[in-house]
Regions:
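Intrinsically disordered, low-complexity segments enriched in polar/charged small residues
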Residues: 10-11, 44
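C-terminal motif of bacterial Sec signal peptides marking the signal peptidase cleavage site
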Residues: 15-18
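Acidic/polar, low-complexity intrinsically disordered N-terminal segments immediately downstream
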Residues: 4, 20-144, 148-193, 197
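Short, solvent-exposed loop/hinge segments that bridge or flank secondary-structure elements
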Residues: 192-214
Length: 214
Protein backbone atom coordinates (compact mmCIF):
# COMPACT_ATOMS: atom_id res chain seq x y z
CA UNK A 1 0.00 0.00 0.00
CA UNK A 2 2.84 2.41 0.83
CA UNK A 3 4.47 1.73 -2.53
CA UNK A 4 1.20 2.56 -4.27
CA UNK A 5 0.84 5.78 -2.31
CA UNK A 6 4.42 6.80 -3.06
CA UNK A 7 3.72 6.37 -6.76
CA UNK A 8 1.09 9.13 -6.45
CA UNK A 9 3.90 11.66 -6.10
CA UNK A 10 5.12 11.03 -9.62
CA UNK A 11 1.59 11.63 -10.88
CA UNK A 12 0.91 14.88 -9.06
CA UNK A 13 4.16 16.42 -10.30
CA UNK A 14 2.62 16.68 -13.76
CA UNK A 15 -0.13 18.98 -12.48
CA UNK A 16 2.27 21.59 -11.16
CA UNK A 17 4.24 21.99 -14.42
CA UNK A 18 3.01 24.56 -16.94
CA UNK A 19 1.75 23.09 -20.21
CA UNK A 20 1.36 26.47 -21.93
CA UNK A 21 5.03 27.02 -22.85
CA UNK A 22 6.38 24.61 -25.48
CA UNK A 23 9.94 25.83 -24.87
CA UNK A 24 10.15 24.54 -21.30
CA UNK A 25 13.12 22.18 -20.91
CA UNK A 26 12.60 18.57 -19.94
CA UNK A 27 13.33 18.30 -16.21
CA UNK A 28 14.55 15.33 -14.24
CA UNK A 29 12.04 14.02 -11.70
CA UNK A 30 14.01 15.04 -8.55
CA UNK A 31 14.26 18.61 -9.85
CA UNK A 32 10.61 19.07 -10.84
CA UNK A 33 8.22 21.27 -8.94
CA UNK A 34 5.90 19.10 -6.87
CA UNK A 35 2.22 19.70 -6.25
CA UNK A 36 0.26 18.67 -3.18
CA UNK A 37 -3.15 17.34 -2.25
CA UNK A 38 -5.17 15.76 0.54
CA UNK A 39 -6.46 12.30 -0.26
CA UNK A 40 -9.90 11.43 1.12
CA UNK A 41 -9.51 8.04 2.81
CA UNK A 42 -12.98 7.77 4.34
CA UNK A 43 -16.23 9.67 4.81
CA UNK A 44 -19.23 8.94 7.04
CA UNK A 45 -22.37 10.77 8.12
CA UNK A 46 -25.06 12.87 6.46
CA UNK A 47 -26.93 16.16 6.83
CA UNK A 48 -30.40 15.29 8.15
CA UNK A 49 -32.85 18.20 7.88
CA UNK A 50 -34.73 16.89 10.93
CA UNK A 51 -31.61 16.45 13.10
CA UNK A 52 -29.41 19.45 12.39
CA UNK A 53 -27.61 19.58 15.74
CA UNK A 54 -26.51 15.94 15.60
CA UNK A 55 -25.75 15.73 11.87
CA UNK A 56 -22.17 15.89 10.61
CA UNK A 57 -19.74 14.57 8.04
CA UNK A 58 -16.58 12.92 9.37
CA UNK A 59 -13.71 12.73 6.89
CA UNK A 60 -10.19 11.30 7.18
CA UNK A 61 -7.55 12.65 4.79
CA UNK A 62 -3.87 11.96 4.17
CA UNK A 63 -1.53 14.68 2.90
CA UNK A 64 0.80 14.19 -0.07
CA UNK A 65 3.55 16.29 -1.59
CA UNK A 66 7.17 15.82 -2.63
CA UNK A 67 8.21 15.58 1.02
CA UNK A 68 5.58 13.22 2.49
CA UNK A 69 3.29 16.14 3.26
CA UNK A 70 5.88 18.01 5.31
CA UNK A 71 5.91 21.03 2.97
CA UNK A 72 2.19 21.73 3.44
CA UNK A 73 1.58 24.75 5.68
CA UNK A 74 -2.21 24.59 5.97
CA UNK A 75 -5.45 23.15 4.63
CA UNK A 76 -8.28 25.68 4.28
CA UNK A 77 -12.01 24.90 4.13
CA UNK A 78 -14.63 27.26 2.66
CA UNK A 79 -18.34 26.58 2.19
CA UNK A 80 -21.30 27.90 0.21
CA UNK A 81 -25.00 26.98 0.10
CA UNK A 82 -26.44 25.98 -3.27
CA UNK A 83 -30.23 26.36 -3.53
CA UNK A 84 -31.80 23.76 -5.82
CA UNK A 85 -35.44 24.41 -4.93
CA UNK A 86 -36.09 28.12 -5.52
CA UNK A 87 -33.98 28.66 -8.59
CA UNK A 88 -30.95 29.79 -6.62
CA UNK A 89 -32.78 32.55 -4.75
CA UNK A 90 -31.63 31.18 -1.38
CA UNK A 91 -28.04 30.45 -2.38
CA UNK A 92 -25.35 31.90 -0.11
CA UNK A 93 -21.91 32.82 -1.41
CA UNK A 94 -18.72 31.09 -0.36
CA UNK A 95 -17.29 31.95 3.06
CA UNK A 96 -14.26 30.88 5.10
CA UNK A 97 -15.10 28.09 7.53
CA UNK A 98 -11.92 26.63 8.98
CA UNK A 99 -8.14 26.47 8.58
CA UNK A 100 -6.19 23.37 9.63
CA UNK A 101 -2.56 24.32 10.22
CA UNK A 102 0.34 21.90 9.82
CA UNK A 103 0.79 21.87 13.59
CA UNK A 104 -2.60 20.12 13.82
CA UNK A 105 -1.66 17.32 11.41
CA UNK A 106 -1.20 13.89 12.99
CA UNK A 107 0.63 10.80 11.78
CA UNK A 108 -1.80 7.95 11.10
CA UNK A 109 -1.26 4.19 11.34
CA UNK A 110 0.22 4.09 7.83
CA UNK A 111 2.81 6.71 8.72
CA UNK A 112 1.30 9.59 6.73
CA UNK A 113 0.44 13.07 7.91
CA UNK A 114 -3.33 13.23 8.19
CA UNK A 115 -6.38 14.98 9.62
CA UNK A 116 -9.76 13.88 10.94
CA UNK A 117 -12.18 16.57 9.79
CA UNK A 118 -15.64 17.09 11.28
CA UNK A 119 -18.04 19.19 9.23
CA UNK A 120 -21.06 19.81 11.42
CA UNK A 121 -24.43 20.70 9.91
CA UNK A 122 -25.06 23.35 12.57
CA UNK A 123 -21.51 24.75 12.32
CA UNK A 124 -21.85 25.00 8.55
CA UNK A 125 -25.08 26.97 8.85
CA UNK A 126 -23.53 29.27 11.46
CA UNK A 127 -20.62 29.97 9.12
CA UNK A 128 -23.06 31.08 6.41
CA UNK A 129 -25.33 32.97 8.81
CA UNK A 130 -28.45 30.98 7.96
CA UNK A 131 -31.10 29.01 9.86
CA UNK A 132 -33.33 26.04 9.12
CA UNK A 133 -35.86 28.40 7.54
CA UNK A 134 -33.29 29.31 4.88
CA UNK A 135 -32.54 25.78 3.65
CA UNK A 136 -34.42 22.98 1.91
CA UNK A 137 -34.04 19.25 1.48
CA UNK A 138 -32.52 18.47 -1.90
CA UNK A 139 -30.28 21.54 -1.84
CA UNK A 140 -26.66 21.18 -0.75
CA UNK A 141 -23.59 22.72 0.83
CA UNK A 142 -20.48 22.84 -1.33
CA UNK A 143 -17.15 22.75 0.48
CA UNK A 144 -13.96 24.05 -1.11
CA UNK A 145 -10.55 22.88 0.11
CA UNK A 146 -7.25 24.68 -0.52
CA UNK A 147 -3.67 23.64 0.26
CA UNK A 148 -1.07 26.31 0.95
CA UNK A 149 2.58 25.28 0.89
CA UNK A 150 5.33 26.59 3.16
CA UNK A 151 6.78 28.47 0.17
CA UNK A 152 3.47 30.22 -0.50
CA UNK A 153 2.26 28.14 -3.45
CA UNK A 154 -1.44 27.32 -3.47
CA UNK A 155 -3.22 24.25 -4.82
CA UNK A 156 -7.00 24.11 -5.16
CA UNK A 157 -9.81 22.79 -7.34
CA UNK A 158 -9.11 25.28 -10.12
CA UNK A 159 -5.44 24.53 -10.66
CA UNK A 160 -5.48 20.78 -10.06
CA UNK A 161 -5.89 18.34 -12.93
CA UNK A 162 -9.30 16.63 -13.24
CA UNK A 163 -7.77 13.14 -13.18
CA UNK A 164 -6.31 13.78 -9.75
CA UNK A 165 -9.68 14.97 -8.44
CA UNK A 166 -11.99 12.42 -10.07
CA UNK A 167 -9.81 9.30 -9.93
CA UNK A 168 -10.74 6.93 -7.10
CA UNK A 169 -7.08 5.98 -6.82
CA UNK A 170 -6.12 9.54 -5.87
CA UNK A 171 -9.39 10.95 -4.47
CA UNK A 172 -7.92 14.44 -4.08
CA UNK A 173 -10.26 16.39 -1.82
CA UNK A 174 -10.58 19.90 -3.23
CA UNK A 175 -14.39 20.09 -3.50
CA UNK A 176 -17.25 18.24 -1.81
CA UNK A 177 -21.04 18.50 -2.11
CA UNK A 178 -23.09 17.61 0.99
CA UNK A 179 -26.78 17.22 0.18
CA UNK A 180 -29.51 17.88 2.74
CA UNK A 181 -31.65 14.78 3.19
CA UNK A 182 -35.17 14.53 4.61
CA UNK A 183 -35.76 11.00 5.93
CA UNK A 184 -39.40 10.03 6.35
CA UNK A 185 -40.83 11.07 9.70
CA UNK A 186 -43.39 8.25 9.41
CA UNK A 187 -40.97 5.44 10.16
CA UNK A 188 -42.51 2.74 12.38
CA UNK A 189 -45.92 1.14 12.74
CA UNK A 190 -48.85 3.17 11.47
CA UNK A 191 -52.49 2.39 12.27
CA UNK A 192 -55.05 3.61 9.75
CA UNK A 193 -58.68 3.76 10.88
CA UNK A 194 -61.18 3.68 8.04
CA UNK A 195 -64.38 5.70 8.14
CA UNK A 196 -65.94 3.17 5.79
CA UNK A 197 -67.95 0.34 7.20
CA UNK A 198 -71.10 -1.64 6.72
CA UNK A 199 -74.17 -3.08 8.34
CA UNK A 200 -74.42 -6.60 9.63
CA UNK A 201 -76.76 -8.45 11.91
CA UNK A 202 -74.54 -7.23 14.78
CA UNK A 203 -74.73 -3.56 13.77
CA UNK A 204 -72.43 -1.02 12.00
CA UNK A 205 -68.72 -1.93 11.78
CA UNK A 206 -65.45 -0.17 10.95
CA UNK A 207 -61.95 -1.56 10.42
CA UNK A 208 -58.31 -0.57 10.87
CA UNK A 209 -55.11 -1.54 9.06
CA UNK A 210 -51.64 -1.67 10.61
CA UNK A 211 -48.59 -1.26 8.38
CA UNK A 212 -44.88 -0.49 8.69
CA UNK A 213 -43.21 2.46 7.01
CA UNK A 214 -39.41 2.42 6.49
Amino acid sequence: MKNLKKSFLAFIAAFAVSCGDPELPVELFPEMEYGAYARKMSQTGEFNYFAIESSALDIHVEYYDGNQGANIAQYDIDVEYVDMIDGGAKSVARKDMRTISASEFTTNADGYLSSDINLGFSATMSTLGITQDDIDGGSYFRYWFTITMTDGRVFDYNNTGPNLVSSSAFAALFRLNAYIVCPSSLEGDVIIDSEDGGLSTLGYWTFSVTGHVD
